[in-house]
Amino acid sequence: MKVLILAAGLGKRMKSKYPKVVHKILGKPMINWVVDLGKAFGEVGVVVGHKADIVKSYLPEDVKTYLQEPQLGTGHAVMCARDFISENEDLLVLYGDVPLLSKETINKLKKEHEEQKNQVTVLTFVTDNPAGYGRIIRENGKVRIVEDKDATEEEKKIKEVNSGIYIFSGKFVLENLDKLSNNNAQGEYYLTDLVGMAERSSTVILEDIVEVSGVNDRIQLAQLETIAKQRILEKLMLSGVTIVDPNSTFIGPDVEIGMDTIIYPFTIIEGYTKIGEDCEVGPYSHIVDSNIGNEVKVIRSEVEKSVIENKVSVGPFSRLREGTVLKEKVKIGNFVETKKTTVGKNSKAQHLTYLGDATIGEDVNVGAGTITCNYDGYKKYPTYIGDGAFIGSNSSLVAPVNIGKGAITGAGSVITEDVPNDALALGRARQIIKEGWAKKKREELKNADHKE
């Protein structure tokens, strides 16, 4: 089956300079929710129009795009993607601003379509307030759709309405697409007219109409985010994850969390993040696109595009940036920042430290205030710290530099040269003591004050 997503609309009511379909729900653009759904069923194509280049920038490379310019209705959108349609495959039509449709619903639609050997199968729903929706009319075993403005008084009483989601026979679409007419008040080509041409058609009635709820403004965007968040959190809790306060916790649709992990309030977990079992995350933590092992603590910290192995402690107030890898039992503490850095097993940097472009061995102690000076204004340089090294507090390691295994740097040192294994490196001025100098200085200052 091929999947065609219609995403060319302007979205005026969003009041935005960005296309409607790139606005996010739980950190993920709506169009990507729909693309991921579509990929579960086959090759995906997207019809773009308004600010097409922006929409394209959000799409995976393997998704084909088709330009609809100008936008002359849903039927016209499918016409613009004629080259995508195959007469040997069915065509599922979805919408870029309908993000909560489920695989289960599409499977039901697909099953009905295949079992009945339909030319078109329509996803419908029943509502007590059908105003504005196309009504479903059944005649002689066929289905047609009457738009609200064209419905008779009797037809307006019908409560089963069109969701806009269809599966077509590709052959049927190619044979009948050119028969669509724009002879209507809007001067547009409607996909609903194609439904009426089918000799073999039926419907699947959707029970949960939230699945086909679209987004037209930011109020509806917020409403769908609330619903999506609730469903994701409930699924996690039913799988063995403790969410202390669901109202203040935000977890994206592509996040995986293991059982017996506890998520504390005011935590945001987004992107393709995987968290293992028996972890504690939060409060006030933000994790994006990261892989976290078992028995890990992330407290009041930021983690982005990082890998954290088992039994690691992060925070409070740590920032792990892209390319960070923390091996087992590492401790990263207060106000420590890392980027493109690997920290070996059992090593720790617990206070006021920056580690960038660094490779740190096992059992290393990085003292408070340590900085890897990795940038000269033009280029980044690496720092290597061997197993068992001890980096004294307030050390500045000027890269490129290699600290050997078991080496020690004295507190307050500026290290500009490689340090051999098991050596002590001191890069600071020698301390000078002048006996009685402070007392003498105070007396001088006191006498000067009296003279004034």
Swiss-Prot record:
Keyword hit for Nucleus: no
Origin superkingdom: Bacteria
Cofactor binding, per record: Binds 1 Mg(2+) ion per subunit.
Molecular functions per Gene Ontology: glucosamine-1-phosphate N-acetyltransferase activity; magnesium ion binding; UDP-N-acetylglucosamine diphosphorylase activity
Function of the molecule: Catalyzes the last two sequential reactions in the de novo biosynthetic pathway for UDP-N-acetylglucosamine (UDP-GlcNAc). The C-terminal domain catalyzes the transfer of acetyl group from acetyl coenzyme A to glucosamine-1-phosphate (GlcN-1-P) to produce N-acetylglucosamine-1-phosphate (GlcNAc-1-P), which is converted into UDP-GlcNAc by the transfer of uridine 5-monophosphate (from uridine 5-triphosphate), a reaction catalyzed by the N-terminal domain.
Record-stated family: In the N-terminal section; belongs to the N-acetylglucosamine-1-phosphate uridyltransferase family.
Protein's UniProt name: Bifunctional protein GlmU
